[in-house]
Amino acid sequence: MATVDLEKLRMSGAGKAIGVLTSGGDAQGMNAAVRAVTRMGIYVGAKVFLIYEGYEGLVEGGENIKPANWLSVSNIIQLGGTIIGSARCKAFTTREGRLAAAYNLLQHGITNLCVIGGDGSLTGANIFRNEWGSLLEELVKEGKISESTAQNYAHLSIAGLVGSIDNDFCGTDMTIGTDSALHRIMEVIDAITTTAQSHQRTFVLEVMGRHCGYLALVSALASGADWLFIPEAPPEDGWENFMCERLGETRSRGSRLNIIIIAEGAIDRHGKPISSSYVKDLVVQRLGFDTRVTVLGHVQRGGTPSAFDRVLSSKMGMEAVMALLEATPDTPACVVSLSGNQSVRLPLMECVQVTKDVQKAMDEKRFDEAIQLRGRSFENNWKIYKLLAHQKVSKEKSNFSLAILNVGAPAAGMNAAVRSAVRTGISEGHTVYVVHDGFEGLAKGQVQEVGWHDVAGWLGRGGSMLGTKRTLPKPHLEAIVENLRTYNIHALLVIGGFEAYEGVLQLVEARGRYEELCIVMCVIPATISNNVPGTDFSLGSDTAVNAAMESCDRIKQSASGTKRRVFIVETMGGYCGYLATVTGIAVGADAAYVFEDPFNIHDLKANVEHMTEKMKTDIQRGLVLRNEKCHEHYTTEFLYNLYSSEGRGVFDCRTNVLGHLQQGGAPTPFDRNYGTKLGVKAMLWMSEKLRDVYRKGRVFANAPDSACVIGLRKKVVAFSSVTELKKETDFEHRMPREQWWLNLRLMLKMLAHYRISMADYVSGELEHVTRRTLSIDKGF
């Protein structure tokens, strides 16, 4: 990772001009990317131009290319679509069109282009870059530009950001707009589920994605669909019989609805398209079910961007500017990608080539290879989907009994994790119990055996269906041990927040006294605070950030209407500032005070002065976030009083404590999927461990690795022993000692126009696309 020197960076853009355009189909989050590129460009001293209507505007020039200032991109982060317009342009595909485009760029001295669009748009940009030299020669010949102009602007640098709801671009885990499109799909599925259940209907849902099945695959996983059609994995011949058999089976088990998800590019083994109407007619003829088709269409492109898309676009936009500043005539055109939770740069044409290879593999019916080329994330989603879709109640019983409980505060995604863990456990042949009300319930014996159908419909439910308490096990150890013995429990799956982790640690530490605690234990971190060690993301934190973000969007709208108003908003999270920081980036907050980033009265003074200066511009509103425990003395009330008195006559101030709103309603697609995957992986890991420690008819597990936290770390799902994690934990403040997201705070401050030290800015390295990086065994 390259660390950038502040003063050099501050002026590194001096004399450079950057043009930014959006091209191809629109995607939610493009505005956040335009905002980040514009502001980062201005931050480093470059001139930034907005190019309206995509390549069409580039070819036509004139009023379509306008200089941007800091305020040009204010208050756009929450808007869907793209404010600078997008178009699919025929003219740019011709040499004449590109000649006109080159001339228009030279009129403004632009030799750096940031293109936000799909693979077609990015390929076009690369052709433009390769031809740049010959285009200039032609312009000199025609007498349109001078020799000296051609020499001064001899090289064109390109940085691409992939904006496409389809997530069909190889080399990046997620493209801009994909997460928001999934939000729209899940909103529709949730709405359809209620009507389908009322009438016992079957719904065939057609989702977008051209020749890529990502949206269909992930929404099928997140909704627990009965059947799925995607172009990368066409069904075997005779699928009609299998599908009808499956649908009939689920109905006979008591299910009141069936959901079939079909990608718009779905085909059979022979490359023949499978249409939603064909599937509907099939179900009606064979099974006589009341069946309806819903084609989601352009709804998926619309609406406000999700928190993930806003943060992703902001991070990628800033990285694109860094890539343009560091580009030389010899560096290839690059595309900024997401790998795990890091941004990296990849050579544009390598990515385009692999993207084309996928299509070629599908055309040549090499479907397994197509799935592999789609990347690590796609392949793992497909494996988990297949596993869940083919799970059945096991005919053979194992000797093991497992119990599942929720501990801590409710968090979205808990029910998804319980559902997939229960079903995986049952399909492995285990006896599965659920415990109501956490460790307290375990002490009181609130334990019941659970069956396959008992968890139907849990996937999209928010909160905790089992009931959850914050009580730790220490005071109730005798009773807990008694019940573990009574029910003969060999493994515990604890889904919850910091209390879940601390509780399992207490049980492990009591193993010396009670042999019954020498069992396999696993913690699935689920808390809105994202403060459990051993994972980068806790279940429920994505839903919480989205809930806080929606509230802040409304608050910002109120402030915009009132003029000269500053809102101070308090978020939850205990001592952990994750919620405040990420929400702050997603809503374009002016500041976010958190415990991990210590601040004093001088910082507060600087913030108030910054706000006063801001009120003199056209943006007459302010939004300040404060984590609930960021400072023992500088409380929300203190900040309100400070801003009110210092801003007297310039702005007025209001406070808002978001409170339990942040626990969210229905879980976001990310939390549904993440919960489902963690439930499956945790249960499979526990099954394997149980087989390892089963000796002479009994389970005895006392090694450190028999009690773990499962979590996503960078790119892989890892199991970390709770005793090992003890060293990494700050128990007083209930959080990990190291926080990966602290580097995001720099982004928040820069986009809010603070002149801060950038010695800590970490820019992504140029990596290469290889088949190896595309499929890692573990991970998501």
UniProtKB/Swiss-Prot annotation:
Catalyzes the phosphorylation of D-fructose 6-phosphate to fructose 1,6-bisphosphate by ATP, the first committing step of glycolysis. Negatively regulates the phagocyte oxidative burst in response to bacterial infection by controlling cellular NADPH biosynthesis and NADPH oxidase-derived reactive oxygen species. Upon macrophage activation, drives the metabolic switch toward glycolysis, thus preventing glucose turnover that produces NADPH via pentose phosphate pathway. The modification N-acetylalanine is found at A2. GO terms for molecular function: 6-phosphofructokinase activity; ATP binding; fructose binding; fructose-2,6-bisphosphate 2-phosphatase activity; fructose-6-phosphate binding; identical protein binding; kinase binding; metal ion binding. Keywords: Acetylation, Allosteric enzyme, ATP-binding, Cytoplasm, Glycolysis, Glycoprotein, Kinase, Magnesium, Metal-binding, Nucleotide-binding, Phosphoprotein, Transferase. Residues 401-780 are annotated as: C-terminal regulatory PFK domain 2. Beta-D-fructose 2,6-bisphosphate binds at residues 470, 527-531, 565, 572-574, 628, 654, 660-663, 734. Glycans are attached at S529. The modification Phosphotyrosine is found at Y640. The gene is Pfkl. GlcNAcylation at Ser-529 by OGT decreases enzyme activity, leading to redirect glucose flux through the oxidative pentose phosphate pathway. Glycosylation is stimulated by both hypoxia and glucose deprivation. Homo- and heterotetramers. Phosphofructokinase (PFK) enzyme functions as a tetramer composed of different combinations of 3 types of subunits, called PFKM (M), PFKL (L) and PFKP (P). The composition of the PFK tetramer differs according to the tissue type it is present in. The kinetic and regulatory properties of the tetrameric enzyme are dependent on the subunit composition, hence can vary across tissues. GO terms for biological process: canonical glycolysis; fructose 1,6-bisphosphate metabolic process; fructose 6-phosphate metabolic process; glycolytic process; glycolytic process through fructose-6-phosphate; negative regulation of insulin secretion; response to glucose. Substrate binds at S164, I165, D166, R201, M208, G209, R210, E264, R292, H298, V299, Q300, R301. Its main location: cytoplasm. This is ATP-dependent 6-phosphofructokinase, liver type.
